[in-house]
UniProtKB/Swiss-Prot annotation:
<dbReference type="GO" id="GO:0005737">
    <property type="term" value="C:cytoplasm"/>
</dbReference>
<dbReference type="InterPro" id="IPR045853">
    <property type="entry name" value="Pep_chain_release_fac_I_sf"/>
</dbReference>
<dbReference type="Pfam" id="PF03462">
    <property type="entry name" value="PCRF"/>
</dbReference>
<dbReference type="InterPro" id="IPR005139">
    <property type="entry name" value="PCRF"/>
</dbReference>
<dbReference type="InterPro" id="IPR000352">
    <property type="entry name" value="Pep_chain_release_fac_I"/>
</dbReference>
<keyword id="KW-0488">Methylation</keyword>
<comment type="similarity">
    <text>Belongs to the prokaryotic/mitochondrial release factor family.</text>
</comment>
<comment type="function">
    <text>Peptide chain release factor 2 directs the termination of translation in response to the peptide chain termination codons UGA and UAA.</text>
</comment>
<protein>
    <recommendedName>
        <fullName>Peptide chain release factor 2</fullName>
    </recommendedName>
</protein>
<feature type="modified residue" description="N5-methylglutamine">
    <location>
        <position position="251"/>
    </location>
</feature>
<dbReference type="InterPro" id="IPR004374">
    <property type="entry name" value="PrfB"/>
</dbReference>
<dbReference type="Pfam" id="PF00472">
    <property type="entry name" value="RF-1"/>
</dbReference>
<keyword id="KW-0648">Protein biosynthesis</keyword>
<dbReference type="GO" id="GO:0016149">
    <property type="term" value="F:translation release factor activity, codon specific"/>
</dbReference>
<keyword id="KW-0963">Cytoplasm</keyword>
């Protein structure tokens, strides 16, 4: 790195930090912290334990954001001053040190940028994820199972917990349908970037002629909502079906109709759960999924209205990413317009950078 490149990098990082400050609004957050301190000083604050806990969580999140921003601000301010002095005094040793530390500074600003991108109220929620293979039988069902494994590995890498809600194995290979919850801080904030159609191009292992096949799978992600958000579901708007839960190869898990499928008639949203032997528990989980899907549905309508576009009724959404294994290897995301060559690592769950690039690109746009 030379003096010109470093100077341009500093300009970019200062611009990024100013944008972060504009989005984060530290003054407003500090004002809210003062309000919380006053509330905590009240004698009857702990009489309402639920509210006190909620405020405590809010306080910790605000402190986390401010600490991260202040660290980045202090670091960049100090670097600006040091660079100005070193340049004026032609201190090559100090300049060389700054060049060497450029990557660390860049990563610090990017980390701060990401934390701001995940500042929406729902971002900290758990993520309810459903994967549905497209047309194409075994080939698409196998692709759905590859995506499922990719997300399980990503959750494992981030020390997130996974709760399986529904799993329907494919007839020959792969899966017909899977729904699960990824539990952890900002799980939804990250996983919302996976909402959409995922396209795979490869030489099919199920084709004796070894021809190249294109497969599609839909990934639907919604935040797990708590009881504070009231989603009204009227009986007349839903149809509930029960059926026997089955395992891989059509093996019955039990002989009672414990599996639940709920159809929300006005929107066409369908959820199902068969993971538990108890029909009652499956029904509770299915309603949880439905409420989250309806909440996400309304959010999407609001976003579409704000952007001046009509919300698509197509549950398949839009193609967001292509995974090409043949004739070359590349994963390319259409939103960030960035291609990645580490295909094997990505399919093994190394998707955090790819998601962060999407978050930055979509927020910048």
């Amino acid at each position: 790195m030379d003096a010109y490149e470093y100077s341009e990098l500093l300009k970019l990082l200062n611009t990024k930090l100013n944008n972060i400050k504009g989005i984060l609004k530290p003054d407003i957050l500090n004002k809210r912290l003062e309000e919380i301190k006053n509330e905590e000083a009240s004698q009857d604050f702990w009489n309402d334990v639920e509210n006190a806990t909620k405020i405590g969580i809010e306080k910790n999140r605000i402190l986390g954001k401010l600490n991260k921003f202040n660290k980045a601000f202090d670091s960049l301010t100090g670097t600006n001053e040091l660079y100005e002095m070193a340049t004026a005094e032609k201190d090559d040793e100090t300049l060389e040190m700054l060049y060497e530390e450029a990557s660390d500074l860049e990563n610090l600003i990017k980390s701060t940028e990401i934390s701001v991108m995940l500042s929406n109220p729902d971002d900290s929620s758990n993520a309810i994820v459903s994967i549905h293979p497209g047309a194409g039988g075994t080939e698409s069902q196998d692709w759905a199972s590859i995506l499922y494994r990719m997300y399980l590995r990503w959750a494992e890498r981030n020390d997130f917990k996974v709760e399986l809600l529904d799993y329907q194995a494919g007839d020959e290979a792969g899966i017909k349908d899977v729904s699960f919850i990824i539990k952890g801080e900002n799980a939804y904030g990250y996983m919302k970037a996976e909402n959409g159609i995922h396209r795979l191009v490869r030489i099919s292992p199920f084709d004796s002629n070894a021809k190249r096949h294109t497969s599609f799978s839909s990934v639907m992600v919604s935040p797990e909502i708590d009881d504070n958000i009231n989603i009204v579901i009227e009986d007349k708007d839903i149809r509930i079906d029960t059926y026997r839960a089955s395992g891989a190869g059509g093996q019955h898990v039990n002989k009672t109709e414990s599996a639940i499928r709920i159809t929300h008639i006005p929107t066409g949203i369908v959820v199902q759960c068969q993971n538990d032997r108890s029909q009652h528990k499956n029904k509770d989980s299915a309603f949880k999924m439905l409420k989250s899907r309806l909440y996400e549905y309304e959010l999407e309508k609001q976003r579409a209205s704000k952007d001046g576009i009509e919300k698509s009724d197509n549950g398949w959404g839009h193609q967001i990413r292509s995974y090409v294994l043949q004739p070359y290897q590349q994963v390319k995301d259409s939103r960030s317009n960035i291609g990645y060559s580490n295909v094997d690592a990505i399919l093994d769950g190394d998707i955090t950078k790819m998601i962060e690039d999407v978050l930055i690109a979509t927020n910048t746009n």
